[in-house]
Design a protein with these regions (language model features):
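Acidic, Mg2+-coordinating phosphoryl-transfer loop and its flanking beta/alpha structural elements
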Residues: 121-153
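Short, Lys/Arg-enriched N-terminal segments with co-localized hydrophobic residues
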Residues: 1-11
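Short catalytic/ligand-binding loop motif for oxyanion handling, primarily in non-cytosolic enzymes
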Residues: 25-28, 77, 84-88, 116-118, ...
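Conserved Lys-Pro-Asp/Glu-containing loop-to-beta segment of HAD-superfamily phosphomonoesterases
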Residues: 15, 105-133
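Substrate-recognition element of Asp-dependent hydrolases with the DxDx(T/V) motif
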Residues: 57, 62-90, 96
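Active-site neighborhood of HAD-like aspartate-dependent phosphohydrolases
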Residues: 12-54
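Active-site donor-binding segments of glycosyltransferases and PAPS-dependent sulfotransferases
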Residues: 86-114
Length: 158
């Protein structure tokens, strides 16, 4: 058992999960791309807008941070897609492929139970969908000591 622990610590990379909305992806950029009529129609439930996720831009520094973390860690994208918006699931896949490359699509996990994934770190801007119960360290993106990607990289690259 001790040998297995030593093997994992020395040989295997630590696992990092990265959320999409509000962490890799600027959700507000999708809202800004909507017409005024769409904004009024979907007020308070923008995650229900068809194709909303395909209209979003990366957060500042997110692409570089993902690539840098991938050099040191075993990085996965762990996100949630709304149940009532069927296009959200495929939009998220296409966003990952278009912004991070096809190899990253094989590291995309969509789940409403993030706490079921085993890893060392979860970078997420919320505690919902199991993020608050994650067994590793929750890096609360956009809050406190982790307001942006620069602060996350400083912490994880130390």
């Amino acid at each position: 058992m001790v040998l297995l622990f030593v093997f994992r610590e020395v040989i295997m990379k630590k696992i990092v999960y990265v959320d999409m909305d509000g962490v890799l992806v600027d959700f507000n950029s999708g809202i800004d791309s909507l017409t005024l009529q769409e904004q009024l129609e979907y007020e308070g439930r923008f995650d229900k807008v068809p194709d909303i996720f395909s209209k979003m831009e990366p957060m500042i520094g997110a692409i570089d941070a993902f690539n840098r973390l991938s050099e040191k860690y075993d990085v996965y994208i762990l996100s949630t897609a709304p149940w009532g918006n069927a296009s959200a699931w495929s939009d998220k896949y296409e966003w990952v492929e278009g912004n991070l490359g096809s190899a990253a699509t094989k590291r995309l996990i969509l789940s409403h139970n993030k706490h079921l994934n085993i890893g060392d770190y979860l970078i997420d801007d919320r505690t919902a969908n199991g993020a608050g119960e994650f067994q590793g360290e929750h890096i609360h993106f956009g809050k406190g000591e982790f307001p942006d990607w620069e602060s996350v990289l400083t912490y994880l690259e130390a």
